[in-house]
């Protein structure tokens, strides 16, 4: 990939200064960058002091055996104590920790004092089932408070949890149970999704059968649906946990004690079990949650819309917010049940002040229309966040304008399952924000963009995003496979962490993420990022969402093929397709014009909302469509395939 190839095609000139009152009272000011630059390890040692340690660490970082980092290694702490007990001891036991909103409209509030009792009871129940320090527990749950309680109960007794998203198949669950050697599974009869109960227990029964190692299955009753039952193995949560003592004294564990394993899909073969440990992970998740959202725990109401099954839910529903003593909303269901204004109804009901959601959701809201959020009082919101993939500038502007009253900062956060916590993001009280850019590494984080030879690219240049210094919440290894850890993340550039993202620096040196490197297309010798072409398409008033892939082309090497979802009532026509093609040409340059544009009703997405471009590539190249098991709706691909041959092409 040549330097100029990813040069900044898209010029974004809009800037948004921080609101004056927020900047004046911000938790983190511009000085933090200078302080961290002057003494990076001292900076992280200071952030670690925001936690409560049983034994304070004297050593910040041991990097004697790279790439295996040890942070705060002589310190000891209990993660659950930090997330629950210490707030009760500080006199905040009556503060609401979780406002739970069920999809069907049921709700309950859990205070920190109640959460402490529930976590203690669950910890005692796990001990009774024979779970010991160092064991692994698999969790396959809907979005209900018991999911967070189960995770914290594991942390409390020193057992590592492996949460598997409730949308995954029994096969996926079985391989994860086997890989982690989990002897206990915590699940529910089901959860509510799109207005009806969605069963979870049958997948667990199949997975447990296949794995052959599970001794106990603990089942929360959520929906009341019928479940198959094995008396020798299955236990109801309410019968096992509710009767336990609410007294449990948490033990302090080493800072490097395993906290959880979270599986992420590998490009090849079996999923990778990403291992996170205790002290460094909690230090960085707590700090970033407090800094990036400017959290004031006494007054803010935080809502992260992710599922706990993803890293965003681990770091910014369970660990970061609770370590900071925040009050937050947890919502079980989908954004359009029972109506398309459900998210805004929830913001209004709880007075949500900080909202953290994904670009895929924002683009969906755009498609549904501006009039829906306009019906609700969203004036409580003061900071908006985005996570999961690069956000198109137009979606960013829509989010700020329609959800944030054209006044709230939008923090576009880049990080990964592997990084554990936010890495590159604006700060709401400091940064003059640019729509579509994550901008700069947080204080204490070292990231840059390099070319093929690992040389840092100049401003205006593009290449690969790398992390050049260890960070507290970094993955420690791939569970059971140190060699794969080295090969996957540390082999491409000597001494640098690289996880597959392309990026560019603009003329100010700010970082723009360009999606996965395999989402970079080579058209007539020019590298063109799918993210930029998608952003150009979405900036057209008729387009709600776009997915772009490169398809092999005899003439140009790769041809750009775009799949677009039109807004609201827009009718598809050949004229519109030509207009969109010209719009991309005018926005990015003629080289970036898609060869084919196909209006579709839906795009293939994983259950976490990421677009599965590889499947679209299969369609665009007339191949048999590959593995669709992680798709939220596998019928989408059939619809797209039947339509493609008729789509006009620009020859």
Curated annotation (Swiss-Prot):
This protein's name: Acetyl-coenzyme A synthetase
GO biological process per UniProt: acetyl-CoA biosynthetic process; acetyl-CoA biosynthetic process from acetate
Residues with the N6-acetyllysine modification: 610
Family that this chain belongs to: Belongs to the ATP-dependent AMP-binding enzyme family.
GO cellular component terms given for this protein: cytosol
Keyword Metal-binding: yes
Function per UniProt: Catalyzes the conversion of acetate into acetyl-CoA (AcCoA), an essential intermediate at the junction of anabolic and catabolic pathways. AcsA undergoes a two-step reaction. In the first half reaction, AcsA combines acetate with ATP to form acetyl-adenylate (AcAMP) intermediate. In the second half reaction, it can then transfer the acetyl group from AcAMP to the sulfhydryl group of CoA, forming the product AcCoA.
Annotated positions binding CoA: 193-196, 312, 524
Top-level taxonomic group: Bacteria
Processing after translation: Acetylated. Deacetylation by the SIR2-homolog deacetylase activates the enzyme.
